Amino acid sequence: MSNKQILEAYRLFDRASSGDYRAKADMVESLTTSDFPQLLGRGFNTKLAAAYQALTPVWSQYSTRTTVQNFKPQTYKQLLGYNGLELVPEATEYPAGDFSETKFEFQARKYGRRLGLTYEMIVNDELGAFRNIHDTLAQAARDLEGTATADALLNGKRTDVNTDFFKAANGNAPESAALTRKSLQEAIETVSQKRDVNGRPLVRPNLVLVVPPALEFQAREIVNASQIRRTDGDTEVTSANILAGAVTVVVDPNLMRSTHAKASKTWFLLPAPNTARPALVTAFMSGHETPDLRYKNDQGNRVGGGSIPVGEGSFDDDTIQYRVRHIVGAAAIDPTFTFVSRGN
């Protein structure tokens, strides 16, 4: 089965979907051959992968991407608490030091859907519904990643923020300040004063301000304005915006999956992805990092002997079953440089 054959099969399907009657006739005939459904399936998988890669996910702007080897709970380890380097006098032994280890757990899970393509649908000219199937499935995969990642910021029932992560014991209990210049500045100052287990000051990483759509323009106005104008008595005073460029604004509609009354006012301050202390991780399984599309070979055998082409449909219901699978997981792991406020 060559790449050329796969491409030709998909192009035939594409022309038939566009209303080419000759292509429709050729496709109906081709569905009775044993290899055409396989070729078409491979073509879908190739187009699905291309469409998937072309979509830029929002979650990648505030969560760190990682891979796992299996479905078992995974441990993300950090070596913390070292005391730094000490002066070593001439001809003396280097001083020993210990690391403390902090562990955070997360897990990848399997998601999917079956889709049935029937002979009747082709004959009855209903191919148009499948013309952009790869785009639809690619978007569904990206949507899944987005909801899984955003849900890590929420509790299990999505009725509030994740209070197992945002809590007083972690130094990031939910606040109730509306998003303003003052509250954002105070939040940045709060996370900038973090220390490690030995009391050593930590260097603040780049930060992202993650907001729902209702706070988008308010957030952008706060951090994108180069100057601020205010009135002092009868005088208009112009000053530099000290928050300009201080954080990167990320707007994630998936935050509105929360049913909390203040979901549209809730804002998060998180470390940028791929920093030393990531707040969130989004996990994929190694070797299965993109959506997988397959067909089901369950058409049975003829009574008189001989195999039946996949294109003639399954034994049970005459459908050609395609199945898409995507493996992903997400979790909140390190609370060090995080802040959340439900607004007021």
Task: Give short role names for the model-derived ranges.
Residues 103, 122-128, 201, 312-315:
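Exposed beta-sheet edge/beta-hairpin loop segments within beta-rich domains
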Residues 1-34, 336-344:
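Intrinsically disordered, low-complexity terminal tails
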Residues 197, 202-206:
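Short gly/pro-enriched beta-turn/loop segments at secondary-structure junctions
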Residues 154, 205-212:
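A glycine-rich phosphate-binding loop feature that marks nucleotide/adenosyl-phosphate handling sites
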Residues 169-193, 208, 214-344:
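Sequence/fold signature of self-assembling virion shell proteins
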Residues 108-112, 204, 315-317:
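Short, solvent-exposed loop/turn segments at the edges of secondary structure
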